[in-house]
């Protein structure tokens, strides 16, 4: 990240795993969004975007209606800037990725991407983020 990018985030204390794998945690000053950077000496670069989903059933909740799981699939149908079904996987394949993937658990949904080298992940991150934050969500998504 550039110095300008770092100015948008607050760095938290670093940690290490096994004395050799450094973990850096950053938090957006504007949104509170947290990101972790784990650097390893491997040829693959993995991206995991994890969003909290409703885990409680109460008077105002959706009572297990499957909405988080439906949205998990719907984001792959396009976004505001990239309104094309399957464009993420097509672009990911250009970065020697095995496509994109996601899963929904009780309390979170995780979107993943693994590419050969960091350049692919960095190039796809804004496109993936647009799909996650601004999906097109047309009626056809729910039929």
Language-model segment annotations:
Residues 1-88, 112, 126:
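His/Glu-rich zincin catalytic helix
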Residues 64, 73-143:
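Active-site-adjacent, His/Asp/Glu-enriched structural segments that form or flank metal-binding
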């Amino acid at each position: 990240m550039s110095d300008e990018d770092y100015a948008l985030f607050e760095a938290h204390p670093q940690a290490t795993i096994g004395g050799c794998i450094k973990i850096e945690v950053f938090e957006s000053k504007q949104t509170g969004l947290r990101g972790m950077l784990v650097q390893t000496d491997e040829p693959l670069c993995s991206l995991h975007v994890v969003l909290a989903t409703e885990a409680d059933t109460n008077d105002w909740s959706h009572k297990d209606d499957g909405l988080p799981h439906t949205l998990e699939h719907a984001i792959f149908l396009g976004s505001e800037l990239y309104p094309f079904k399957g464009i993420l996987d097509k672009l990911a394949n250009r970065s020697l990725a095995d496509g994109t993937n996601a899963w929904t658990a009780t309390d979170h949904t995780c979107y993943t991407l693994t590419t050969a080298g960091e350049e692919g992940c960095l190039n796809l991150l804004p496109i993936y983020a647009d799909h996650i934050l601004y999906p097109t969500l047309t009626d056809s998504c729910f039929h």
